[in-house]
Amino acid sequence: MRTANAAAGRTMRYSWIAVGLLWLAGVGLRLTILAVPPVILLIQTDLSLSGTEVGILSGLPVILFGIAALPGSLLVARFGALATLVAGLLIAGVVSGLRGAVLNVAVLYAATIVMSAGIAIMQPSLPPLVRAWMPHRISFGSALYSNGLLVAETLAVLLTIPFVLPLVGDSWRWSLAVWGLPLVAICCAAVFAACPVSRLPRRPF
């Protein structure tokens, strides 16, 4: 009986870890993308961007979401959903920070393309993870990462100007680096917390 209770406790604990990981993965889908609009005027002034160049910068992520979705699905099939999620988070988080080191618009475009591709390959990994971790609560699992996505859109826009920019001396470069850090942290959480979650049988909450 004691062994059964301990196993049930572990299963419940890891179920809640799965809840947190799915929500955080949703946060990672938008956080670095929506960090740009609040500082776009600073970027435009610093790099002397034209209106057309600003438009291209804003549109690149959307284009990459479409282009890289299929390769993302192939990566999930080849390496697994968790490995693809971790790779996407790491790419997006690191390259988001590197955007602050760019010296011209061409390099900024290149960094934005790589970062957006990292996010795009993450998206096909989430439905398989929901099915693996929450087979009895697929709708709930899907709602989790969707909610994380929406919260991330709000956080980046809401906090950048009043909080993040003052902390980094009104530097758009450091602001983008700051917003890349959560993705690296989520990546680490996925690496260390998801393995035991994946090994345990799932059951309804």
How should each PLM-predicted stretch be described?
Residues 111-148:
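Cytoplasmic helix-loop-helix junction between adjacent transmembrane helices
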Residues 34, 62-70, 154:
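Residue-level signature of mid-helix packing/kink "hotspots" within the transmembrane helices
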Residues 17-51, 69-72:
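Extracytoplasmic
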Residues 67-106:
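Conserved MFS/SLC helix-loop-helix module at the cytosolic interface between two early adjacent transmembrane helices
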Residues 89, 93-96, 111-112, 180-187:
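A generic transmembrane-helix signature of 12-TM secondary carrier transporters
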Residues 22-26, 30, 96, 104-116:
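Helical-face signature of the major facilitator-like transporter fold
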Residues 30, 34, 116-124, 154:
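Small-residue-rich segments within alpha-helical transmembrane domains of MFS-like 12-TM solute carriers
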Residues 104-107, 136-198:
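Helix-loop-helix hairpin linking two adjacent transmembrane segments in secondary transporters
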